[in-house]
Amino acid sequence: PVLFLADGIIAQMMEPVEMPEMVDYKIDPEKKPWACTGWKPGDDPAKRGVINSIYIDTETLSVHNDELQACYREITANEQQWEEYNLEGAEYVITAFGTVARIAKSAIVELKEQGINVGLVRPITVWPFPYDAVKKAAEQPGVKAVLDVELNEGQMLEDVKLAINGAKPVDFFGHLGSQMPTTEEIKAKIISMKEGK
């Protein structure tokens, strides 16, 4: 199964898409016992891919929780995805996902024309969150601050702050109620940060 997460704007857009030739991936349940691969009568019920944490016996529960944590660590290590844009020489870094990341890219292009170099880190996966990528971008020489731009009231903001861990100031700009942040608003926010406001 594939799950696409999209905001309201992306969900209503249409544009040409090039799909690569389909590859039929066969998942070996023995290699990924955590994956929900379906179950049919006659299969071993213990291998259904159901995540269960209702174990009355504390020792069994402890072993099970250790196994889950090992899975989470493996997923975190191998499944982070993100895009970096215009980070080289950036004075400011924007973090944004979904539609807002597209708008932020337009703002970055226009700010560059005004002599302000801004980069972007766009998480493709929000879990596992690309903490190291955000941290690395923020710690580049010359980066003064990070602006988190979202189409909400900061659902990703805490993760951005955790990634940066106080190394640089983090500011936030967002909108609610289907009101989209504009290129001009993002530019104005970066300019106000540059001016120390």
Predicted segment positions?
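A general structural motif
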Residues: 64-80, 96-103, 123-130
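Generic long, charged, amphipathic alpha-helical segments
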Residues: 105-137
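Conformationally flexible catalytic loops at phosphate/diphosphate-handling active centers
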Residues: 1-84
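Gly/Ser/Thr-rich loops at beta-strand to alpha-helix junctions
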Residues: 9-11, 97-103, 127, 152-156, ...
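Short acidic, glycine/serine/threonine-rich loops at helix termini
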Residues: 13-20, 105-106, 133, 158-161, ...
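General beta-strand structural signal in soluble alpha/beta enzymes
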Residues: 3-6, 120, 148-149, 172
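Peripheral docking tails and interdomain loops at the edges
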Residues: 150-197
